[in-house]
Amino acid sequence: MICRFIDTHCHFDFPPFSGDEEASLQRAAQAGVGKIIVPATEAENFARVLALAENYQPLYAALGLHPGMLEKHSDVSLEQLQQALERRPAKVVAVGEIGLDLFGDDPQFERQQWLLDEQLKLAKRYDLPVILHSRRTHDKLAMHLKRHDLPRTGVVHGFSGSLQQAERFVQLGYKIGVGGTITYPRASKTRDVIAKLPLASLLLETDAPDMPLNGFQGQPNRPEQAARVFAVLCELRREPADEIAQALLNNTYTLFNVP
């Protein structure tokens, strides 16, 4: 099966994939999705994500502490991340999912920023790119990224900010994750941003099982839906479909060094 697409962000360690891995990967492959990057969200599931990557050839792992799960992260969690990265597992391709999130009544933003800084330091130490979560925090996140100046940079996944914010990330060397949001006609701002950014700055993703596509609301998202995201992306861009597909693959290989 030819790998036409890579889903650069899928939580394959979550239901509905748990216990259905073989069939889920087969469905993805039939849609042309030949490789999938699985970002961890907390130290408790590092072992699960690593085992998935080790046991299933299409899967690659990222390890990180998600800002939206702050109550689950302790200093010990950070030590566990460092220890896991120190072992340099062959199929760990990034630090993530990490970042900043201002959702909720008490986001503990100072602690979030400290945790982000510590994880950016680890990414730099172990020469890995980062997979970034950002909700209502694009400008602040860009400040942190500029200060740390990672040589391998990373991707801002699920981007839904302004063109100016996206261009700032791109100027810093970061990619922009393109997912199901662009399948919603009402998401005109995001669609316009993705249409205008350089093709070399884009990556394909689903964020499955979250972020269902337009027409699939209420259903778990799945990695094979990356093909539908790609189809909509082609409607928004001027380049030929084959050129877009090849660029997305090249961008992913370059950033994550996925073999």
Curated annotation (Swiss-Prot):
Its cofactor is a divalent metal cation. Its EC number is 3.1.-.-. SUPFAM superfamilies: Metallo-dependent hydrolases. Coiled coil: none annotated. One of its GO terms (molecular function) is hydrolase activity, acting on ester bonds. A divalent metal cation 2 binds at residues 97, 133, 157. GO terms for cellular component: cytosol. A divalent metal cation 1 binds at residues 9, 11, 97, 207. PROSITE patterns: TATD_1 (PS01137), TATD_2 (PS01090), TATD_3 (PS01091). Binds 2 divalent metal cations per subunit. Keywords: Hydrolase, Metal-binding. Belongs to the metallo-dependent hydrolases superfamily. TatD-type hydrolase family. This is Uncharacterized metal-dependent hydrolase YjjV. It comes from Escherichia coli (strain K12).
